[in-house]
Amino acid sequence: MTSIVLTPWWRHRRPASARAGEAPGSAVPTAILDWRHERVQELLADARSAASGTGERSLLLAAHRLISERVRAVYALDDAQSASRTLARRRGSCSQRLAVLEAVARAAGIPTRVRGLLVDGSFWYPRFPRLRHLVPDTVVLAWPEFRLGEEWVGVSELYAPLGSLGEANPAGFTNTGSQTLFEALASTAVDWDGSTCGADGCSSFDLSAVVRRDLGRFSSRDELFAAHGQTLCRPARIAGGALLGRRSAA
């Protein structure tokens, strides 16, 4: 059983229109992706120094690794928190850390956009086995995409194609233990579309069953949350953040 009491249940989160799929993306700063801030600029400089190559993908991989090392995974609830604030706190949720990665990308001139997914709350049951009744009915997930060359690359395939990641780690992502969605990107296939399913069935890393709705693509996560709201209503975010904001995701 999941809860809708703490969510903005009055919002009608409808599937994306055909036009929503045309989101052009951007590299401009936003309230969340405040890449002009000195903390984001410092992370960009460090990522450039740590990158194994000179390409844009190498830069993003280095930034991802640095964020994993420097920003502790916690159950923070404010998806609209700026990237610079997350860096200052040195802790953040998967959503907040993905926003930091996006901010670094934009700071480097790499356009980004997000795909909005409405994910079933049961996906997070393994994290909160004794608090299932408080887990939101659905979670609004902003899943980044990066413009690398002439194509958009989803964050799920930043390290390698889903097939290659699946072969390397057939167990898939279980949403348990210390590996969060953010860390999983480096070694595990995260398949929201069921694209890895074949004639003989679906793989263990197919997560399409927990996707309630595809909200479409937006030029920024700011636009997604403005259109569909965050997972929890403001009072719930404040109360929940005070209780869970420092709790490690493990």
Where are these predicted regions, by residue range?
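His-Asp-centered catalytic microenvironments across diverse enzyme cores
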Residues: 2-10, 15-24, 32, 119-250
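Secondary-structure boundary elements
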Residues: 3-89
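Generic hydrophobic/packing signal
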Residues: 44, 60, 96-98, 102, ...
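Residue-level signal for well-ordered alpha-helical scaffold segments within enzymatic catalytic domains
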Residues: 65-66, 103, 107, 146
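Active-site neighborhood of thiol-dependent amide/isopeptide-bond enzymes
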Residues: 77-135, 139
